[in-house]
Amino acid sequence: MEGFFWKTWLVVAAFAIGGTSSLPHKPLTYEEAVDLAVSTYNGKSGEESLYRLLEAVPPPKWDPLSESNQELNLTIKETVCLVAEERSLEECDFQDDGAVMGCTGYFFFGESPPVLVLTCEPLGEDEEQNQEEEEEEEKEEDEKDQPRRVKRFKKFFMKLKKSVKKRVMKFFKKPMVIGVTFPF
């Protein structure tokens, strides 16, 4: 009987010293992390339309109990719903020509409170530029009967136009970086 008392006392003391949980946050599954990243983008990006998950690439080892940094990669697409409507994402269909964003998120669980840093940038712009360049080359071939100086003049302005357009697009299409803390 006396041995049972000391064993029980030892177990109670071990729990009191160690605590019931050594994690500073509740476990976060991969699906919850992706949902949190999408809702963070919708809430902090300043976009008029809501974005919904298009694809998520699960990492080989997502540990919901980890205190170290965790990375996730996802693709989101613009929907027909506006942010101001405050509708559920399940009710929102994708826009046919909606913007597609490639996002990388980093969860820093070692911080108190935990931190999410989300970086998103537009996808698919290179295809549009290549299509425009092909159309311009076709126009140039059709205009081969023009005098030489007209051709040079047009070629110069086409290069100038491409350069200006490229710089403007690069300036306005910088990746969006969002950093937030979230309580658990």
Curated annotation (Swiss-Prot):
Residue stretch(es) of the prosequence: 23-150
SUPFAM superfamilies per UniProt: Cystatin/monellin
Biased composition (Acidic residues): 125-144
Name of the featured protein: Cathelicidin-related peptide Pt_CRAMP1
The entry's keywords: Antibiotic, Antimicrobial, Cleavage on pair of basic residues, Cytolysis, Disulfide bond, Hemolysis, Membrane, Secreted, Signal, Target cell membrane, Target membrane
Signal peptide, first to last residue: 1-22
UniProt KW Signal keyword: yes
UniProt cross-references to Pfam families, sorted A to Z: Cathelicidins
Organism, as annotated: Pseudonaja textilis
Disulfide bonds: C81-C92, C103-C120
Subcellular location(s) of the protein: Secreted; Target cell membrane
One example of a Gene Ontology biological process annotation: killing of cells of another organism
Tissue: Expressed by the venom gland.
Family: Belongs to the cathelicidin family.
